């Protein structure tokens, strides 16, 4: 992955779509929009992209249609997203995600959800992601 390459993933509310664009010059110019809804099998609201290492990205957000908190793993720097993981669901409110790397090297993903409470009274929830880079696991 080139140092100036940027991947941007957005939801288009009007078109009921999720798309990505690429920049190869640090954000000065951008590629044409590419629809990734078929790859994700959902409209991903509030997509949150986290680079875990040079080639691996975690994409998380809300699957609008299924009312789920989901994440996907890309092992090719955002070209393909698969390995869908359903973290939680919600009744009427929830699912916006955020991810941070901990000092242990693990990643903490947090979201809110009313799956186990009254509707519209969400709890804050979290999970740890244990990710081992390929360079760490091969030696």
Tell me the role of every PLM-derived stretch.
Residues 1-139:
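Asp-box/BNR beta-propeller blade signature and adjacent active/binding-site loops
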């Amino acid at each position: 992955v080139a140092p100036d390459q940027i991947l941007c993933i957005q939801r288009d509310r009007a078109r009921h779509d999720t798309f990505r664009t690429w920049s190869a010059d640090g954000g000065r110019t951008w590629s044409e929009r590419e629809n990734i809804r078929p790859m994700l099998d959902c409209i991903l609201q509030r997509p949150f992209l986290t680079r875990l290492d040079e080639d691996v990205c975690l994409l998380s957000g809300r699957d609008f249609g299924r009312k789920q908190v989901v994440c996907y793993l890309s092992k090719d720097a955002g070209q393909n997203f698969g390995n869908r993981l359903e973290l939680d669901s919600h009744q009427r409110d929830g699912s916006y995600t955020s991810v941070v790397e901990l000092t242990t090297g693990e990643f903490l993903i947090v979201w809110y959800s009313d799956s186990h409470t009254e509707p519209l009274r969400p709890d804050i929830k979290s999970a740890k992601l244990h990710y081992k880079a390929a360079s760490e696991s091969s030696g």
